Amino acid sequence: MSDHTQCRVCKHALPKPFLDLGMMPLANAFLSSKTECQNEKSFPLAVSACESCGLAQLNYVVPAEQLYRNYIYVSSTSEAVRVHVQALANMLMERCGLGANDLVLEVASNDGTALREFQKLGMRVLGVEPARNIAAVANENGVNTIAEFFNAKTAQDLAESHGRVSAILARHVFAHVDDVHDFLHGIHEFEEFAQLRVLNGFRTTAAQLPVKQSC
């Protein structure tokens, strides 16, 4: 568990939490026996707001290896997600000029539900998903997926092995990232290759990145 005393973004000293919910077990981990309940681990859940940049953030972070290596939620179980990503793929094809054989990279790609829509449009796809159990499902379904966390090192390896990327998706992931600077350094590993668009949620928004081209 990581105890944060500095803001993740601006590195200013964090004040005391404005909200402290005490010790909490991990979400999406229902237990089936009394013995399991007695041995269940709990972690602090407290939130501070940086007085310099205003970012609200957790003071304590459960190790990513413990949270995300074996994950429960699967994207394909949600009809709303399936409808959304189908529209998203078509929108990006039109807006960014994506076409056959372009390579689309998705960070935290889950079981490949979104990337399959790009495959249907004739594009090549690559997923980066830390949950080994879910990455295995994606690969079984024909969606090329790397079972790793996305960071500068992973991105550098992928840029060297796969070359030009035409679009990068990151949906519902940035808020889960502890080291946001390392994550963004990873995005920038592709800037010489790609038209980049970072997407967030059902309401699609774009983060402007200092890249040579942007769709």
What are these regions (language model features)?
Residues 1-80:
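N-terminal juxtadomain amphipathic helix
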Residues 29, 196-215:
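Short, glycine-/aromatic-enriched active-site segment of Class I SAM-dependent methyltransferases
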Residues 100-110:
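Conserved class I S-adenosyl-L-methionine
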Residues 111-122:
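Conserved SAM-binding loop of SAM-dependent methyltransferases across substrates and taxa
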Residues 124-129:
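Conserved SAM-binding motif I beta-strand of class I
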Residues 142-155:
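Conserved SAM-binding strand-loop segment of SAM-dependent methyltransferases
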Residues 166-169:
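A conserved beta-strand element that flanks and buttresses the S-adenosyl-L-methionine
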Residues 181-198:
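A short glycine-rich, Lys/Arg-flanked "PGG" loop and its adjoining helix->strand segment in the class I
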